[in-house]
A protein has these predicted regions:
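Short acidic low-complexity segments
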Residues: 85-94, 101, 216
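Conserved AMP-binding
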Residues: 66-70, 190-194
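A short N-terminal helical cap/helix-turn-helix that marks the beginning
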Residues: 2-23
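Gly/Thr-rich phosphate-binding loop signature of adenosyl cofactor/nucleotide-binding cores
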Residues: 63
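ANL superfamily adenylate-forming
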Residues: 96-180, 221, 225-233
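Conserved AMP-binding/adenylate-forming core of the ANL superfamily
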Residues: 23-55, 155-181
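Alpha-helical oligomerization segments
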Residues: 3-4, 24, 185, 209-210, ...
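Conserved short alpha-helical elements in the N-terminal third of ANL/AMP-binding
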Residues: 79-82, 197-211
Length: 233
């Protein structure tokens, strides 16, 4: 099987010290979500299976993430990457759209997926546009292990950055991820944007580190930094 950095990363996250925290989210209304490597891999596998089995996603297709920097947005990016999809962060054309605001999605995508951001949401609150998929209601029914139907292409585009760089799947770890020291526990402000959150998270995870992602409404106190043991760079 052809491998790419995203697949290798998910393998590392679910093996070794798989119960250690890898992604911690602080959101509005005192929301705190912590995902170990094993739990993060589980969410990513289920999301990849939803894309592949329910939406017929294949390597080379494009997945637009109209989402803020949030733990579920990181899950979606990883799910797309291990499938070999291109992640689109701007308003460019895409086969699939994952969004927290499906009301204005239009009809230019093969599928629109509504992503409810609250951690405990079991389904979308309110009405959805016709044909829109409810991520919270659907994702839990999908398998915990992802087995790709087709090999990803390492030379295909994984993401285009805000400054116009094209990052191939083969270069996701070396050309997009930001470098962090071994085992670092990195704080990432969500208001720096999703691209920053993804680059920082990939850089931390590939060196056995972890990420604390905080919403702009969350006060970054000395107690929070101490409780989360933020360290390294």
């Amino acid at each position: 099987m052809t491998t790419i950095p995203a697949i290798d990363l998910m393998g590392r996250l679910r093996s070794g010290n798989s119960t250690a925290p890898r992604l911690t989210w602080y959101g509005p209304d005192s929301e705190r979500v912590e995902l170990s490597g094993r739990v993060l891999d589980n969410w990513v596998a289920k999301t990849s299976n939803l894309l592949q089995d329910e939406l017929d996603a294949e390597p080379g297709m494009r997945l637009r993430l109209a989402l803020p920097a949030h733990w579920k947005a990181l899950v979606w990016a990883l799910a797309g990457w291990q499938l070999g999809l291109e992640t689109v962060l701007d308003d460019g054309a895409a086969d699939f759209l994952a969004t927290d605001d499906p009301s204005g999605a239009g009809d230019q995508h093969d599928a629109v997926i509504a992503v409810a951001l609250p951690a405990l949401a079991m389904r979308w609150t309110g009405e959805l546009p016709a044909g829109c998929l409810d991520y919270a209601a659907e994702v839990r029914s999908h398998g915990d292990v992802f087995m790709p139907h087709s090999d990803p292409d390492p030379s295909a585009c994984a993401i285009r950055t805000h400054d116009g760089r094209t990052i191939l799947h083969s270069d996701l770890a070396s050309g997009f991820a930001l470098h962090h020291s071994e085992g670092a526990r990195v704080h990432v402000p969500a208001d720096h944007g999703l691209e920053s959150a993804l680059a920082n998270a990939l850089g931390a995870w590939q060196h056995d580190g972890s990420v604390v992602l905080t919403h702009a409404d969350v006060a970054l106190t000395d107690k929070l930094l101490a409780d989360e043991r933020i360290h390294g760079s």
